[in-house]
Amino acid sequence: MQCYTELTPPTAVTHSVTLQLVPGQGTNLAVAKASLLQIFKTKVVSAEIDTYATLNGTNTSSKAAAAGRYDSRLVNDDDGFEASFLGGDNIAARADRANSAKLVLVAEVTLPGTMTGLARIKKPSGSSSGGADCLLLSFRDARLSLVEWNVERNTLETVSIHYYEKEELVGSPWVAPLHQYPTLLVADPASRCAALKFSERNLAILPFKQPDEDMDMDNWDEELDGPRPKKDLSGAVANGASTIEDTPYSPSFVLRLSKLEASLLHPVHLAFLHEYRDPTIGVLSSTKTASNSLGHKDHFTYMVFTLDLQQRASTTILAVNGLPQDLFRVVALPAPVGGALLVGANELIHIDQSGKSNGIAVNPLTKQTTSFSLVDQADLDLRLEGCAIDVLAAELGEFLLILNDGRLGLITFRIDGRTVSGLSIKMIAPEAGGSVIQSRVTSLSRMGRSTMFVGSEEGDSVLLGWTRRQGQTQKRKSRLQDADLDLDLDDEDLEDDDDDDLYGEESASPEQAMSAAKAIKSGDLNFRIHDRLLSIAPIQKMTYGQPVTLPDSEEERNSEGVRSDLQLVCAVGRGKASALAIMNLAIQPKIIGRFEFPEARGFWTVCAKKPIPKTLVGDKGPMNNDYDTSGQYHKFMIVAKVDLDGYETSDVYALTAAGFESLTGTEFEPAAGFTVEAGTMGKDSRILQVLKSEVRCYDGDLGLSQIVPMLDEETGAEPRVRTASIADPFLLLIRDDFSVFIAEMSPKLLELEEVEKEDQILTSTKWLAGCLYTDTSGVFADETVGKGTKDNILMFLLSTSGVLYIYRLPDLTKPVYVAEGLSYIPPGLSADYAARKGTAKESVAEILVADLGDTTHKSPYLILRHANDDLTLYQPYRLKATAGQPFSKSLFFQKVPNSTFAKAPEEKPADDDEPHNAQRFLPMRRCSNISGYSTVFLPGSSPSFILKTAKSSPRVLSLQGSGVQAMSSFHTEGCEHGFIYADTNGIARVTQIPTDSSYAELGLSVKKIPIGVDTQSVAYHPPTQAYVVGCNDVEPFELPKDDDYHKEWARENITFKPMVDRGVLKLLSGITWTVIDTVEMEPCETVLCVETLNLEVSESTNERKQLIAVGTALIKGEDLPTRGRVYVFDIADVIPEPGKPETSKKLKLVAKEDIPRGAVTALSEVGTQGLMLVAQGQKCMVRGLKEDGTLLPVAFMDMNCYVTSVKELPGTGLCLMADAFKGVWFTGYTEEPYKMMLFGKSSTRMEVLNADFLPDGKELYIVASDADGHIHILQFDPEHPKSLQGHLLLHRTTFNTGAHHPTSSLLLPAVYPNPSSLSSNSEENSPHILLLASPTGVLATLRPLQENAYRRLSSLAVQLTNGLPHPAGLNPKGYRLPSPSASASMQLPGVDAGIGRNIVDGKILERFLELGTGKRQEMAGRAGYVVGTGAHGVNPAGSGKMMGGGGGLSLGGLRLNGLHGQEGGMEWEEVRGELGVVLGWSGLGYF
């Protein structure tokens, strides 16, 4: 009984496509990351605010390199993003005029399936729903889903689903299972149909309906062609609803490729071609099977077929035989080139529409592999395996080539008339950006005229841009032409003019078009990166270590209390994109200063203008009234204090570059009382201090200018201010009698005046919370009011009954929006939403509307803070309003997924020195710029930032350390765009959010340290706090010159040699993350594993020491046996380099053992005597380290093929061995005598990539993952009658992870703040969690559950699966079951004893948080959560405790417990408690 939860989203980009999906956003980019679909748009920003190098975790060296590339292109680029469509005529003269294109996330959807392809499908011209295009998705096991954008729901909507995995379609009985064949999705460029190639040679055709071409052609001329015929409306009724099912597609059908042509027995690749009237497909195939093709040459065939969708028939129009056998891809080329480009490992061949071929050989090996006629460009020495090709400039015949090592090349076609006469390749020089791509590319998608998205599975995906350099003559000519240009034209006009210049009139010849294009767009290309998507894929290996700083340094002293106990370190990426990813759950702030400030209860930093002398004040007001201070440093800090006796005061401090100092001699009165809020108004001419009993206004020198008392003139009451919100020129106060006070500052007198509350609702309603918001994005704009007015300030109020009111200031006559259902927390909030009677309400304590984002893009969000500090986020969106439609009918709020639960308040002793502090309400703080983020901070016992970047959704990240009771932004010369806060321990810190880490992309802190060579493994050495990284660099393979049997090898002189790996060990300092030592292995020696082992180093004293063990393989060809080697290194102290104290460590070789047969593939500790378990070839051997530097074998176990992992349950001698082809072996090791015994085995037909233990109290489970993405739960139980006395392992269940198959794992202890009933562990056995890592970048946990918790959560998951709509029409339950095609051929891993127990899917449980309170209550009751009772002691994440520690939240002395009704409240707390354990990083808080 376990629960599988994915902690991070996949980051490896597998597919991408550009389309017009969302109306009004131009071109969108759809990105597939295995099971995550993301939709982006682009935004052009000035290079002055280009922050991808600072907000996306690039290190110092990479930022310097990026700066170098950036500077080099400034001399050639005027406007960056669109220079090429201006013909390259604009040559940059100033750096501040350069622009960059940025990606902005529009939507993301997690799919219960693995995407294998994306395709753009254009909608018919008459379609009115959504955008101009639909998106077609293909999935494993031959499934298609057609989706479109739903404007009203602001999300993707499924149009149709298509399944083709029927048994009769798979083929012959001897054909391999369906999942072993890759699926290929291709679409016709004119969107007439799409094709899905699945199984061995099946082709599913999905036709799309097309309008009558003669009727719907844009060039219909009524004078020549007569009146346009009327469309047949017989299928429609009066209200517009059709009686005929209106679908954009026709019934699909499946064709066997052999029916197209009998010789299509072994298809390789296919693509739809351009410029054909009917759908036309080009198929590359082989006449021989791959196994029978060795020794044969030129047996590939390229054929072109025209498809008749009505008759379901085809016609062969072209066939080219005798093609090289290393071709692997067909690339369809648009006009004017046309035809198809066949890509091979050693050549490129173009086939035009008439069958004429032109090709080039790109390396010397081509002559030996083919007799096909090719132009020789062998001096390029290119390897085209894994390359990517896309259009760069079609009118110039230029295509971009990206090799598998990331190098850029330019393919140019020579066009004579209407035919292609040849092609050539030119590599881009590194100084022109030819090496900006670091990894192999999986997808290319053209975004604009000079930008292209480059997706990768092995590193960061980037948005690549290019410009063209020109000579002085062309520059001079460009300037002359610029004088005649109309500079008022917009981009679309210029683009249209460009097209007119390129193609001219309809009668213009291709030669004229080409010459015009060359005249406009000549010059060398320069490439640079505009933006990037963070990736931690693939995760090769994981370890954990302690954060470390220089001993006795100021940083070490300052970081005390705000550093995590451990950090997760992963070896990620491949090739030049390899890196170490350092991950922490919470933000680790960069401490600028630290001091004790126990009385601080609130911070507010302000920057105000100096008052102007009266002699300089004109008739129209002060001369500096329009001066913007937003970029100025903060000058003053107001601090609210509470001393030990509970006396409340406020002080003001002057901020300096060195810190801050107390300010005296002003009219600021500390004894006036406790400050509730502070800020500036009157365009920063007045400093506002909101006290509990009054509001004070000061000028820029803190001279008192006005006092506004809180006095009700009618009743004489003096209500006290509870919360306040400032949005110049308005002030909103929420008082303890639930009334509101609204004031406006006059622009001339700069004095506050109360705004008359004309609406009776404002005076008769009790208000719980509220805020002011300045709308800068236009989401809340009133179309009837012009921009630039003060009407963009809105007031949001929440009544005690849970109703949301929105007023547009200064109009207080009536609200512009009323939503009565806010307290029900619905998935979508509108003015018309209504809940059923008796539905439970949430206790909402605070609302805040704030902009979230970064310097690239920010957007408003409505943030609800619940009584237990949980947060709910809503994103507002508008529908296009019709004439006369009220504002409330066009505004909607969409709930944003957030599975982060607040921490429990710390338990305090009853005789606490300050009983008032537990009762004090700490409102959320809006921060406009903290390290470039527009963010919101949540103070209290669960201090958190809500962070968002342009490329991510909002994420709630906690701040490392204890609770926070005061916080403010802090922008000074010594701490730019930082913040100051005081924790509950009385420590105040001036800090910054580190800019070398990423946060919002994965929901945790990620810092990438580039390694530059392929990283295989990483290990942490605790005594020295250093990391050893096992890498493999590539080098040319040299034949042994001293071989006595092959003396001709010494005379080898070939230049194009194969590349092989050579192992390198790198020692990294945990302080500076720099390489301080390097050890190279022998040629052809590859590092396979690196582990830190506690070994016995002395046979006489039995001394133990932490040493680094390395396993390698020597592979010198298939005709020589593979040998292995075991190294044991110590990390010794040496004299450091001057100025580099971290270089005081070096790797020292202690032992080295050659293994004559087989590679050393895995290492582990074993037993209690300091021995090591070595997986060497087909044996697993226990070895001990001798003092003479040898490794003595003491016990062994024979294995079958190839051992992928060995694990020992620490200190028990229980070992687990996984074979790549023969399953899992469970063994035991004894030390007296030395012996290894086989306890049990799994099935011998299971391909195991990784295996590990998962203890659960007195039960011990074995977790094995195979190549198909299945996680198998096995158990050793000799008492079970079917286990043959334990010789066969019991199979408990199998769970499908899709593309996220675990390849690495860590068994970690689970540490909960309070005991949990979810883990079935006795007191003497601590709970454990298995952390899993996959090649897609997904980190996941597998944790055991107790019986009663498993039953409830499993029932809840079933209800969510059956009761919620699922994206793309997929089935989450079927997704987690073993693949149908895989299970048909898969033997059970062990004796079936699962008795129907499946692993609970945490991804489904996360969707429980999407529901409103009514649906939550209903589902929780059905799942067995008892209404009205306690939470059965479930409180692992502190759930079930209200803020303030007293069972409820106190605001101004009022207890808010049960304010909104608590039907089912305890029930929700019980569900929340159990979800808080199984979702997220619960139990792993030490990271």
Curated annotation (Swiss-Prot):
UniProt-listed Gene3D superfamilies: YVTN repeat-like/Quinoprotein amine dehydrogenase
Keywords from the named record: mRNA processing, Nucleus, RNA-binding
Cellular-component GO terms for this entry: mRNA cleavage and polyadenylation specificity factor complex; nucleus
Biased composition (Acidic residues): 486-504
Positions of region (Disordered): 486-513
GO molecular function, a single term: RNA binding
Primary location: nucleus
Pfam families: Beta-prop_RSE1_1st, CPSF_A
Gene Ontology biological process terms, A to Z: mRNA processing
Location of this chain's protein in the cell: Nucleus
PANTHER family linked: DNA REPAIR/RNA PROCESSING CPSF FAMILY
Family: Belongs to the CFT1 family.
Known function: RNA-binding component of the cleavage and polyadenylation factor (CPF) complex, which plays a key role in polyadenylation-dependent pre-mRNA 3'-end formation and cooperates with cleavage factors including the CFIA complex and hrp1/CFIB. Involved in poly(A) site recognition. May be involved in coupling transcription termination and mRNA 3'-end formation.
Protein name (record): Protein cft1
Gene source species: Neurospora crassa (strain ATCC 24698 / 74-OR23-1A / CBS 708.71 / DSM 1257 / FGSC 987)
Gene: paa-3
